[in-house]
Each structure stands twice: as C-alpha cells, then as structure tokens.
Amino acid sequence: MPAEFLKIHPQTPEPRKIQHVVDCLRGGGVIVYPTDTVYGMGCDIHNARSVERVAKIKGIKPQKNDFSFICNDLSHIADYARVSNAAFKLMKKLLPGPYTFILEASNRVPKILNTNKKTIGIRVPNHAIPRQIVLLLDNPIITTSIKDDDDIMEYPTDPEEIFERFQHQVDIVIDGGYGGLLASTIINATTDDFATVREGAGVFASN
C-alpha cells in the first residue's frame, strides 16, 4: 500500500493533521518530514521495530545506526542527555536552529539507539512541523537523512519527488514545502571544547 502524501502548513500546522501523523507514529509508522534543513525520515524512538525499519530503509544494521533524534525544546533534551552548563548555554543560544549536538546519552535513551559510543545526536529544529509532532507524541522522533551517505547526488528538496522515491517504504510523506540543500551543522558537545564535526547550514566557529 503506497504511503500517504500529506500536505501540512509549515508555519501553522493543522492540529488534526499533526494528530494524524502522531497516531501513525504510535502505531509503529515511519514518516518523511520537513525540517529547517533537509527532509528527514523518522519514527518514535521508543518503537524498536520502527527504528529497525528505518535502518533497513537506510541499508544499515540497527546496531550500527548513528541516528539522531528531534526534541521539542531544551528541557526535553535534558531527559535524554547529560548536558554541561557550558553546553546548555551554547544550545540556548543556537537552538532552535540547524544544529545537531552530540551529547553523552542518558539511561532514558532506548538501547537500540545507544550504540557502543554511548553518545547521541540531538536536534531542536527551527521548524513547526517536527516540533509539533514531537510535542503531541510526547516522545522524540528519529531524524536521519533521506539521502544515502555514499550518494553523491544533492539532497532531494521537492516533496513530490521525495514521495515518488519513498512511497512504498514509509507510511506518510509530509509535504511542508521545498526542503533545503544543506544538512545540519554537527557540534560535539561531549566536552566543553565544542568541536565542529560537520559543517552544514548552521554557522558555528569551533573553540
């Protein structure tokens, strides 16, 4: 059965549509959704089967995943990661925004996401759709690129093209308008040195 192609207003998401997406996630669904950078693929982080499904779509072993996840705000982050005072100040300055922070994972991170590295990537995007989804779901959602790591092509930006590509692999593709071309900037905040792991859409000068 093909995925549902669901148009949602990017600035003022319709509550009934957000509820529909959340119901899908609670039922083990996998979605493709817009962010403040590129389109992402995700599921409820507490549904191991759904996480495994995302890993299969990405062509990786679940135990080898490096999935990040989306939180609604800074207080939500503190539930899943250990955050130093310096890291909190930096995140308060930069978030919501196009950044992924690598942090030490807390015990609340599901085992399937807590790889041997014991760290986790966390985002608070400056985009209403994913944050409203997370807020209503009351759980973070996985965020991983819809582009393969070894794919030399640019990130897909047209929601209709994205739907054509993933309609037989996911449950809902959200059309929130055209996506960006740059992924998030990744900052390692496991120490207070704050090293840039990957340059992306967010501007940040490492210490």
Outline where the language-model segments fall:
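Active-site-adjacent structural elements in enzyme catalytic cores
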Residues: 1-207
